[in-house]
């Protein structure tokens, strides 16, 4: 009787396992299938790809369990995997299309459905490559993009090595919010070739991955495409600070002050670098967060000059580009100012005395004429 019950129990377990897509060799060992139809899809967004899959076989009736998936992916050659655990059947992320992509995924069954321990399926794997055309040397060289004053994006490049004069390059870009990739409409040219792009106003493009592809064409040989990804706030080059001033706080302190650069960047987003010089020799170089700097000084006779430049700080970006230096502002100590005034007033005083003397002579000459005229008539 016990043997019959045991046989019935085993048969029941087998039927349940078959129905739910799992197999069980004991009460604690359950196996689950990996996801189906795992693939990487390129929607034409220059590096922003879709990873998608279908549920494992025979899990449609597993209603009491929430199935999860562990997804790992990376560019081929990268040392680390990105890992995501999700309940969805798709995931999106950006990749470097200059390299291949590899990804793998498996199914996770939670402990509530598996007698107290999580069950993982085997891995399903896939890869994706852009079919390369042309040798690597034909792609653009020295690509450089700058977001000037957080307003205007400009990218420039040099032609590939050994390309012929008929080679021309075209730039395409995309960021989240655009329906499709757009081509540059305002190229910078040199000798008839496109060597850069001036972008239009980029609405709602901050703090998003910005994808660029520069491809090329030539009648003589294929040209290799290049892909670039960055975020605009990390390549901002602001304007330099303005309205530099000095204020003597005490006999041993001078306060340097300036105003934030013109433009849309908030004051809280700036770092500043100051360079202070004494007689063309660098005295101090400092980085500050505010628009003031107090300098300790003991020699009142020296001349001090300073310049300031700005950069977007870590509170508003991960990186940035220093602005150009501001116009130079100089201050002179008291004694030196007196000497300067003396050098100015000495020649001016001499000229003033000379003018007074000559004026006096001219005013005295008319007084001699009345005496001379009567004497002249008396002699006749």
From Swiss-Prot:
Extracellular side: 27-343
The entry's keywords: Cell membrane, Disulfide bond, Glycoprotein, Membrane, Receptor, Repeat, Signal, Transmembrane, Transmembrane helix
Gene Ontology CC terms, in alphabetical order: external side of plasma membrane; extracellular region; extracellular space; plasma membrane; receptor complex
PTMs per UniProt: Cleaved by MMP8 leading to a soluble form that is also able to interact with IL13.
Residue ranges annotated as Cytoplasmic topological domain: 364-380
Molecular-function annotations in GO: cytokine binding; cytokine receptor activity
Chief place where the protein resides: membrane
Compartment(s) of residence: Cell membrane
UniProt keyword Membrane present: yes
Pfam families in the cross-refs: IL6Ra-bind (PF09240)
Membrane-protein topology: Single-pass type I membrane protein
Classification via InterPro entries: FN3_dom (IPR003961), FN3_sf (IPR036116), Ig-like_fold (IPR013783), Short_hematopoietin_rcpt_2_CS (IPR003532), TypeI_recpt_CBD (IPR015321)
Glycan-linked positions: 115, 215, 290, 299
Signal sequence, start to end: 1-26
Tree of life domain: Eukaryota
UniProt motif WSXWS motif: location: 322-326
Transmembrane segments: 344-363
Disulfide links within the chain: 65-113, 145-155, 184-197, 269-316
GO BP term (any one): positive regulation of cell population proliferation
Induction: Expression is induced by STAT6 and NF-kappa-B.
PANTHER family: CYTOKINE RECEPTOR (PTHR23037), INTERLEUKIN 13 RECEPTOR SUBUNIT ALPHA 2 (PTHR23037:SF45)
Subunit structure: Interacts with IL4RA. Interacts with high affinity to interleukin-13 (IL13), but not to interleukin-4 (IL4).
Job of this protein: Cell surface receptor that plays a role in the regulation of IL-13-mediated responses. Functions as a decoy receptor that inhibits IL-13- and IL-4-mediated signal transduction via the JAK-STAT pathway and thereby modulates immune responses and inflammation. Serves as a functional signaling receptor for IL-13 in an alternative pathway involving AP-1 ultimately leading to the production of TGFB1.
Domain writeup: The WSXWS motif appears to be necessary for proper protein folding and thereby efficient intracellular transport and cell-surface receptor binding. The cytoplasmic domain functions as an inhibitor of IL-4 or IL-13-dependent activation of the Jak-Stat pathway.
Family classification: Belongs to the type I cytokine receptor family. Type 5 subfamily.
Designated name of the protein: Interleukin-13 receptor subunit alpha-2
Species, as recorded: Homo sapiens (Human)
Gene that this sequence comes from: IL13RA2
């Amino acid at each position: 009787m016990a043997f019959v019950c045991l046989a019935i129990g085993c048969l029941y377990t087998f039927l349940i396992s078959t129905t739910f897509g799992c197999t069980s060799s004991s009460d604690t060992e359950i196996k689950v299938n990996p996801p189906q139809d795992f693939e990487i899809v390129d929607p034409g967004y220059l590096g922003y790809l879709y990873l998608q899959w279908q549920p494992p076989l025979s899990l449609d009736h597993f209603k009491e369990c929430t199935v999860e998936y562990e997804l790992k992916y990376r560019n081929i050659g990268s040392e680390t995997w990105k890992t995501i655990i999700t309940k969805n059947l798709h995931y999106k992320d950006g990749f470097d299309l200059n390299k291949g992509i590899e990804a793998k995924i498996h199914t996770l069954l939670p402990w509530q459905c598996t007698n107290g321990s999580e069950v993982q399926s085997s891995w399903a794997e896939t890869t994706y490559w852009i079919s390369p055309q042309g040798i690597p040397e034909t792609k653009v060289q020295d690509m450089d993009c700058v977001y000037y004053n957080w307003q205007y994006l400009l990218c420039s490049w040099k032609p590939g090595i050994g390309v012929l004069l008929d080679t021309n390059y075209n730039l395409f870009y995309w960021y989240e919010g655009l329906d499709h990739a757009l081509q540059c409409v305002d190229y910078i040219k040199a000798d008839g070739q496109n060597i850069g792009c001036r972008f239009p106003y980029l609405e709602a493009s901050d703090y998003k991955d910005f994808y660029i592809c520069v491809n090329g064409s030539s009648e003589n040989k294929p040209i290799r495409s290049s892909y670039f990804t960055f975020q605009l706030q990390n390549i901002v080059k602001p304007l330099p600070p303005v309205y530099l001033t000095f204020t003597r706080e005490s006999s041993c302190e001078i306060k340097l002050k300036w105003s934030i650069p013109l433009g849309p960047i908030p004051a809280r987003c700036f770092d500043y670098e100051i360079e202070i010089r004494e007689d063309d020799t660098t005295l101090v170089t400092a980085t500050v967060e505010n628009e003031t700097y107090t300098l300790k000084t003991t020699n009142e006779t020296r001349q001090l000059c300073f310049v300031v430049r700005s950069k977007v700080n870590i509170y508003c970006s991960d990186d940035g580009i220093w602005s150009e230096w501001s116009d130079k502002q100089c201050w002179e100590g008291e004694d030196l100012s007196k000497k300067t005034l003396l050098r100015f007033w000495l020649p001016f005083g001499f000229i003033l005395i000379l003018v007074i003397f000559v004026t006096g002579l001219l005013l005295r000459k008319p007084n001699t004429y009345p005496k001379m005229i009567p004497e002249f008539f008396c002699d006749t």
